[in-house]
Amino acid sequence: MAEAEAQFPPLQDGDDFFHVGSDRCSEELRDVKQVLFQEEDDSASDYGSYKRLGKVTSRTVPAGNMLFPDLFQTNNLLFYERFETYKDYMLGDCKPSEVKEFIAEYLEKALKPSGWNAIWHTDVFDVLVEVTDVEFSSLNAIVRLSEPFLCESHVSSIALESIKDLLDVKDQRVPLQEIRVVFDESGLYNQTALAIEHLRFFYQQIWRPWDEEEEDYFDYFVRCVEPRLRLHYDILEDRIPSGLVAEYSSLLLQCEEVYMQFTNLRNNLSNKDSDSESELDNVSMVEGMKMDNEMENLKRKLKLIENPLLRYLFCYQRNSGCHNVQAKGPRPNGGKVIHVVSTSMSILTLQCLTRERLQPESGNKDLEIQFHRDPLEAVNACYEGDLVIICPGLYAVYGLINIMDSIEIEGYGLPDDVVIEKMGKGDTFVACSGAHIKISNVKFVQHEAVEGIITIHSGKTELDNCVLQCETTGVTVKKSAELLMKYSDLYGAKGAGMEIYPGSKCTLIGNGIHHCRDGILIKDFIDVVCEIPKITMENNVIHNNEGYAVVLVKPSLDIEKNSHNEELEGGHLDDDDKMIEEQTSSNILQPNLNKAMGVEDKAVEHTNNLEKDQGNLAIAKEEVECEYAIDCEEAEGNQVIATELVANTRRKTKLHKKRLSTLGIVTADDKLTSQEIFVSIVGNQFKRNGKGTFGTFLF
């Protein structure tokens, strides 16, 4: 306290607080500001006063054995930091031909021109240099070797004289992209390090050699920089399918190679004497036109992937995995192979596995067994008819499990013991396209994914006693695909737990679907009129979902209004049409509660027999009312879903037949029954769903 009183003496009467010790207070306030706002300290320099975008979090130690000084760590910038710098300060609204000019202007304001050390980094060597000047127009730094001489070669030893000779040849000029700023605690060179990082990142990740030859009427940042920057960070965050990333890299390499060949050919043609080699020039010009056409095609493909909307519409489905790999079919030499997946296995586990699973399959003495450490590796090695047995353990999968052949995947043990965890966000977890695929006793886990957990593109897939911990969408059953899901548990989807497309067949028996946005989403499109869904739901428990237990997505009445008017103009509605219209317009569906009423009658008779005992009567009545309420709720939920979907499909079928009749096409007037849509819908329980049992979404 004594020290505090000495440092801050009490105010006297008449003193002004803001004038007491003003010099000392100003110094202390500056110290506080410097501590609290270190990154905003201008350091009395015009270069430092330029707006600071991004941050230098810490120093980093250079790789290698040479004792180089620490460097600024600038490679961990966020998307918005780079975005704001390129948009507002480096590029602005420049045209492709003005890019270099705008960058030079930015560097003049943000860069210290001299007095700082750096490491000149190349593929062959690293050497410590001192920057004496910067040529902004050419984006070069004028350097000299630091003392003492520090150099590390990645190939062989390089002497001091060799580096000096190289600098003499380069006239002491080094590209700014190749230098890394040495860390300085004073903060004077923070913005210098950041500016060079922005420059290096731009030319490594954003700029393309052919950009300056593009049309000069568009905004370069909007057309090229923003989509490429977003794509780069989407790839870093694993939000792009791995197949699409590989395709983009391949296209980029092809485009660079063709552009280099085209540029060399164009330079050769411009240097030749047109009179002496006219015939050869004509051949070269034709070849150049072919290269130019190939370049344009490659650039269009690159732009298709770089644009987020076009990438989602045209590229995601192509790279979902189902189209990239062909089914292998039966093994060329015949036979069946059992693939055993295990990271490690005890003798006891091996004995149990042999006794319980391998010996029953060993009717064929030539049966082959292959061992793998990764489920993805095992699936990729499968041919039609193979069996994959996954031993207990946690398996991390980097990539898409693409099942194209009819195989069986079985977890050896309980699902919670056999866990396959998806690493990465961009790929679908499992894609099924085989004629008959069976997966049992396996738990699939997603984290921060942007694609669904299982997608069935075609064929029949069985899920038996599986656990699906979803992230976005759960199981998707595409057109012409079939799913049989039994005794499985699905939860955690931010979208629908299941998506059922028109033309698919889905059988759900004894499953739990819970803690999703919606339980089951049934899609119904106006242009798919003959694709009658086949859905079986028995003894499922759909509960604790945020929205509805079951949602039907169908066109709004406005979309079908013209078709309905045509139907009215063609004549009066028949009885079936009137019934459908009434069901659709009223949207009041009366469930069949005969069984529930039967329960009520029995309950009344039972209570009449207990009239003598008033206490027992009250208890029995309460129990019966509870039982009746539960039965009514379950019966109503099942009946509402069945009735609404039958009515919707009947309506679509009638509209379709009316359209055909106007074209003179007559079809058999087969009555649509509920059995054509639902093989069975009984015993399902719908509990604690946020919006109720059944909902309709109109688009």
Curated annotation (Swiss-Prot):
Keyword annotations: Coiled coil, Cytoplasm, Cytoskeleton, Repeat
Sequence ranges of the PbH1 repeats: 480-502, 503-524, 532-554
A Pfam family of the record is Beta_helix
Enumerate the InterPro entries for this protein. Beta_helix, PbH1, Pectin_lyas_fold, Pectin_lyase_fold/virulence, SHCBP1-like
Annotated Gene Ontology cellular components are: cytoplasm; midbody; spindle
Coiled coil located at which positions?
Answer: 603-627
For this protein, the record's SUPFAM superfamilies field holds: Pectin lyase-like
Single Gene Ontology BP annotation: fibroblast growth factor receptor signaling pathway
Report the subcellular localization: Midbody; Cytoplasm, Cytoskeleton, Spindle
Q: Which superkingdom heads the taxonomic lineage of this protein's source? A: Eukaryota
Where is it chiefly localized? Answer: other
Name the PANTHER family for this protein: SHC SH2 DOMAIN-BINDING PROTEIN 1, SHC SH2-DOMAIN BINDING PROTEIN 1-RELATED
Protein role: May play a role in signaling pathways governing cellular proliferation.
Protein's name in the database: SHC SH2 domain-binding protein 1 homolog A
Which organism does this sequence originate in?
Answer: Xenopus laevis
